[in-house]
Amino acid sequence: MQNLPKWKIFLSIICTIFAVICALPNFTQVKSKYLPHDSVNLGLDLRGGAHLLLDVDFDTYLNDTMENLADTLRKSFREDKIGYKNLLVKQNNIQLELRSQEELKPLKRIISKIDPEINVEANDNRIKLSYSESRLSELLNKVVDQSIEIVRMRVDSTGTKEPILQKQGDRHILLQVPGEEDPTYLKNILGKTAKLIFHLVDENANVEEAVKGHVPMGSMLVQGDRMGYLVVKKKAILGGDSLTTAAASFDQNSQAVVSFSFNSLGSKLFGEVTKNNVGKHLAIVLDNKLLSAPTINQPIMGGSGIISGDFTVESANELALLLRAGSLPAPLKIIEERSIGPNLGADSIESGKKAGIIGFAAVCIFMVWSYGLLGLFANIALSLAMLYVLALLSLFQATLTLPGIAGIILTMGMAVDANVLIYERIKEELNKGTSNLYAIKTGFESAFATILDSNLTTLIVAFLLYIFGVGAIKGFAVALTIGIISSMFSAIIITKLLIDIWVKYFKPKKLGLV
């Protein structure tokens, strides 16, 4: 008398019930707080949307970093009374001339305190400062990683768009937003660095002379759409990194503005600046463009304020979004753009459905024709494997792409291949004259190692595709991995259990394989 392993029965029932619950949201719109409600997340090629490839302008970032370093050096040289001249930033390095060779040693001491990864090249009194290759690589990785997070916050501020963001190469970012029908909006919010800076206005400067090129030392010229030119102090009072909130609102004249609040440190500094500069103007500059320059009528100790500038409601909301997400460390350039319409995505889904149904039907017909009732058991196991795949895709919110559908269809054949291998082993045992029970037991045991080896090698390939691939290749790898795991479970556990139940309760004289 054959005993059915209770753990197999229990495991199969639990897995199947769990799979039905997880896959249910794909077939009904009814939501329940007690059940999962996530359906399969469709990729760009199935749902339609926007595809952008962004280039991180690291050269601009590096030049700005060098400019800041140059300002720091000027201050340090003055404090240490180091004589120099012609300190300039050229081609992402700093060049200067020292007063004498004796100044080189204190210069190196200052550089080592600022950043030991800065290389110092001396040719007589001429000095060239540049970052080491290791520091450049570290900075590039940091800038790209920061840019990815800020892009994510800008594109998905509400947490509902589920953008796909991946690093490509050293300085490229792949952005895919399924369901986004307006790529122009994406380009608008990604094309702005959103670097907000507060400057005191240089009240003594002559704007007309500054426009002609005679800008006072320590000041700079900025321009705005509404206010024209204005000379401001080059030193920033506060930056957008001190903001905690930013939101679109309306002033007393019902004009759209952006209200903001500083963090505790920013509030304290803002209060001190406004207290010490009552009656002067404070310029608000965004990406080197003058937004406004209100007069400081009284100290602002609350750490909040508004930005005006002829905003529409849409532009005020956009600016508030950019400020909340934070400024990009470097400008982004769009080097590739594609837009996939929802109709094309619907066509892809329909094509995928047809391919899946035809493939499934062909496999089922082949198995029944070749192995009779045992082929039917394999088809039942295959159906459950597809249910498990759908459930796992929904549970883990894996993105299903068109190549992913191809991966699932591929696993159909692999699942049946495992059953074919098992049945052929059983057939070999039956041809030797062994009993049905022994043939089934030996067939599954002898085929298991081969099935495991073949699936493990495929899993290794899928893992490598996921690690080194991007976009649709990752989707294929994920679907293939889930399909392999599900098909192995169904072929080894479900099929064996169905055959054992049939043999125990119906006691067939022949298995129909000889």
Swiss-Prot record:
NCBIfam families attached to this UniProt entry: 2A0604s01, secD
Subcellular location, record wording: Cell inner membrane
Function text: Part of the Sec protein translocase complex. Interacts with the SecYEG preprotein conducting channel. SecDF uses the proton motive force (PMF) to complete protein translocation after the ATP-dependent function of SecA.
GO CC terms: plasma membrane
Keywords, comma-separated and alphabetical: Cell inner membrane, Cell membrane, Membrane, Protein transport, Translocation, Transmembrane, Transmembrane helix, Transport
Self-association state and partner proteins as the record states: Forms a complex with SecF. Part of the essential Sec protein translocation apparatus which comprises SecA, SecYEG and auxiliary proteins SecDF-YajC and YidC.
Name of the featured protein: Protein translocase subunit SecD
MF annotations from Gene Ontology: protein-transporting ATPase activity
GO biological process, one term: protein targeting
Keyword Transport: yes
Signal peptide per UniProt: none
Transmembrane intervals: 7-27, 357-377, 389-409, 448-470, 482-502
Protein family membership: Belongs to the SecD/SecF family. SecD subfamily.
Gene: secD
A Pfam short name: SecDF_P1_head
Membrane topology annotation: Multi-pass membrane protein
